[in-house]
């Protein structure tokens, strides 16, 4: 193994050039689960912690990083990433060990490992296996066509919600995932790359929430649909139908990705997409250092938000 020279840096400022280099590599790696809202919010989230290896040059360029978010007694590790030319040279083990030493002892470590890394992560720090994440990809036009025969509901763009309606959305989100994510949702919906819709029943009560956000490089024109929380399977399909129309109007040439977990009501949508003969790919396996019981109401989770800035499922 050739010797590699680098420096260690912890918790760089949100405006550091390292974050731009990190985002570019995340998008280039094709980690579509880590959408543009994740890469936009992570640098400035109060919960973000990070350890970096940087080059021993005046530029201090990106070599590698471990990035996690601390909240609700969990350290959710969203990124363990090395520049390609530094892989297999021992840098990863060094920054991993430093990161592990920085995490509170009373917190559970959680992460989603790509299939090739699951065994390694289980042996290192996270032996408890949780949900598996699969993704289904289709054209927006195909998505819209598959939904045209379904009925819709009274809906409203999240960007058009009144303050009272947004408060109701925060409560609905909390009921589903068992966490108060107000601060995160407020930041999430300020991003230009995010689009969201809620469905109301006849009493103007929220019965579904669905969102989309760009993922990967902008020129790839790919959107990740997440979350989809809904009161029932029929309402979930109504939300998908409504949202297909919104997406088709705004981004008719785009691709959409649905990352589904094998918990909650994810199996319902897995069956639906398989009926369309879409072959899924496994994005990752959820791993924890300790037992981590699910909170909230899993029956309403058709698509998890799957955002490491504030983990839901």
UniProtKB/Swiss-Prot annotation:
PANTHER family: SLL0310 PROTEIN (PTHR47237:SF1). InterPro entries: Acyl/Acetyltrans_Enzymes, Acyl_CoA_acyltransferase, GNAT_dom. This is Uncharacterized protein F36G3.2. It holds the Pfam family Acetyltransf_1. Residues 6-152 form the N-acetyltransferase domain. GO terms for molecular function: acyltransferase activity, transferring groups other than amino-acyl groups. To the C-terminal of C.elegans F21C10.9.
């Amino acid at each position: 193994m050739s010797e590699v020279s680098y420096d260690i840096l912890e918790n760089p400022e949100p405006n550091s050039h390292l974050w731009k280099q990190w985002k570019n590599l995340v998008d280039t790696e094709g980690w579509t689960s880590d959408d543009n809202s994740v890469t936009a919010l992570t640098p400035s989230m109060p919960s973000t912690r990070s350890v970096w290896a940087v080059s021993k040059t005046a530029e201090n360029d990106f070599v590698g990083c471990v990035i996690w978010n601390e909240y609700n007694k969990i350290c959710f590790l969203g990124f363990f990433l090395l520049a390609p030319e530094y892989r297999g040279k021992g840098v990863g083990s060094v920054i991993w060990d430093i990161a592990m030493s920085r995490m509170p002892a009373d917190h559970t470590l959680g992460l989603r490992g790509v299939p090739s890394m699951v065994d390694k992560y289980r042996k290192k720090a996270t032996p408890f296996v949780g949900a598996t994440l699969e993704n289904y990809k289709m054209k927006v036009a195909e998505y819209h066509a598959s939904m045209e025969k379904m009925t819709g509901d009274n809906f409203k763009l999240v960007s058009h919600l009144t303050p009272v309606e947004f408060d109701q959305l925060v409560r609905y989100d909390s009921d589903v995932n068992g966490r108060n994510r107000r601060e995160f949702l407020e930041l999430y919906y300020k991003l230009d790359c995010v689009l969201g819709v809620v469905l109301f029943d006849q009493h103007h009560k929220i019965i579904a929430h669905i969102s989309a956000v760009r993922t990967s490089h902008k020129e790839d024109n790919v959107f990740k649909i997440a979350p989809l929380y809904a009161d029932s399977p029929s309402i979930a399909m109504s939300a998908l139908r409504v949202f297909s129309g919104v997406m088709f109007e705004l981004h008719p040439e785009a691709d959409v990705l649905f990352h589904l977990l094998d918990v909650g009501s994810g199996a319902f949508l897995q069956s639906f997409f398989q009926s369309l003969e879409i072959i899924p790919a496994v994005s990752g396996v959820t791993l924890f250092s300790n037992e981590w019981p699910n909170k909230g109401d899993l029956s309403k989770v058709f698509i998890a938000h799957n955002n490491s800035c504030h983990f839901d499922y």
